[in-house]
Amino acid sequence: MPKIKGKENLPKEGNYVIVCNHFGKSDPIVILSMYKKKLYIMAKKEWFSTKFKTAFFTEFGAIPVDREKPDFASIKKCLTVLKDGSNLLVFPEGTRNKVNSDLQEIKGGAGMMAFTAKVPVVPFALKKKFKPFHKNELYIGKPFDYSDLYGQKRSSALDDILTERIRENLQKTVDIAQGKIKAE
């Protein structure tokens, strides 16, 4: 279990989308280990290649997503999860980051889903790649929402704004976790 900082930033009520940087295959397990209630996770469709894997990952709340093209079925499932009051974990970089510093390009799905479901986004940051029996840290950043944008029609310009807010807030949370800046 990692050392968790910023627990006070977790919303006490309601559901939300968690966005987190992504270093390794164990990242979802690390985050799942700290949760008491059901947490759904977007996971690459390749994890669902056999009936056994599909059953296993589905039991843990994984929702398969095709990272190569828009996957409307996955988005619909995620929106249903949010509408039903559960939380959703998304790794918006779309793949593992092998560099351990700045974020890779952020994909647009997490912002769009939070905006559509009208739920806040909570940025999580792993300080570095998780290693068993080592000092591992997870920092929970301040939640943000898109309430100032509600009522706007979906457009590519709006999607860019949603994605940029994810990138800015997640990068700030990563920088705090890695000691580059101080938490406010």
PLM regions: where:
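N-terminal signal-anchor transmembrane helix
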Residues: 1-13
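Residue-level marker of motif borders
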Residues: 1-3, 22, 88
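Alpha-helix initiation/capping motif
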Residues: 46, 64-71, 103, 155, ...
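Short, flexible active-site-adjacent loop segments at beta-strand->alpha-helix junctions, enriched
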Residues: 8, 22-23, 35, 45, ...
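Non-catalytic C-terminal accessory region of glycerolipid acyltransferases
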Residues: 75-184
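A generic structural signal for alpha->beta connector loops
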Residues: 1, 36-38, 59, 85, ...
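Catalytic core of membrane glycerolipid acyltransferases/transacylases, capturing the structured
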Residues: 10-69, 77
